[in-house]
């Protein structure tokens, strides 16, 4: 944890003050550029102070990305923070989801930016497409849904948790396949299964889409770290990756 003096020293930097001012004005792109330039040559202690400053100001992507830059001294509560903890934990429990998996997925999807938008049109903490969100809202009886509400953490988490539960159920509760499906679609995740069972790590390495391959790796690694930070299930990454069923068994499960 950075000292009060270290925090004050980083907060006094002109570049940091400009970055924070830009964030307050809602100029996220310009603010991020200024932030990155300011922290580019910082040592570990200064980086942790900058990450803590971002945490105090609720700039969660900078908290994570800045803490991730340290080389020898690490603070995993900054690398793996728990913003919107009550909202996300409530929905995880409601859908019987592993909380570290939910936080690990959100960390990768949006870096906890509640109004994040992707180039593909996905929105919010759990990066839902409006069409998917609208369909889920109808299923769960969410009234007066419109896509502008996807920026509200409680709405996005409720819809996203339902969808994550849906893809998990479609793959026998396997988080590796669920993560692949969440990113690339259930059909693709299923088509990448081998005829015979294989180790989860091998399945991940054979995903043909580089983006999805890296996404699954990061979500699963995030899950392990969040479990450690949150005091949950301490299984290793290898254990969590598990074994992927063969394609025929997968097809049979899908038809049940």
Range-by-range predicted roles:
Residues 1-9, 15-18, 25-256:
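Catalytic glycan-binding domains that act on GlcNAc-containing polysaccharides
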């Amino acid at each position: 944890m950075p000292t009060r003096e270290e925090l004050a020293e980083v907060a006094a930097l002109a570049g940091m003050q400009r970055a924070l001012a830009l964030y307050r004005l809602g100029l996220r792109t310009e603010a991020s550029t200024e932030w990155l330039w300011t922290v580019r040559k910082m040592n570990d202690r200064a980086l942790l102070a900058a990450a803590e400053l971002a945490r105090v100001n609720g700039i969660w992507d900078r908290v994570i990305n800045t803490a991730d830059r340290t080389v020898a001294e690490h603070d995993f509560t900054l690398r793996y923070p728990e913003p919107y903890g009550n909202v996300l934990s409530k929905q995880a429990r409601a859908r019987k989801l592993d909380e570290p998996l939910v936080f690990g997925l959100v960390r990768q999807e949006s870096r906890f930016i509640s109004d994040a938008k992707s180039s593909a049109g996905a929105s919010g903490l759990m990066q839902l497409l409006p069409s998917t969100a609208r369909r889920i809202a109808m299923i769960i009886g969410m009234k007066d849904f419109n896509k502008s509400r996807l920026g509200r953490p409680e709405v996005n988490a409720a819809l996203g948790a339902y969808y994550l539960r849906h893809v998990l159920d479609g793959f026998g509760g396997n988080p590796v396949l669920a993560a692949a499906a969440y990113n690339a679609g259930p059909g693709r995740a299923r088509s990448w299964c081998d005829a015979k069972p294989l180790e989860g790590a091998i399945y991940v390495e054979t995903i043909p889409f580089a983006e999805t391959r890296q996404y699954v790796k990061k979500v699963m690694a995030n899950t392990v770290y969040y479990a450690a930070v949150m005091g949950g299930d301490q299984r290793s990454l290898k254990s969590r990756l598990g074994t992927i069923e063969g394609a025929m068994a997968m097809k049979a499960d899908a038809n049940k």
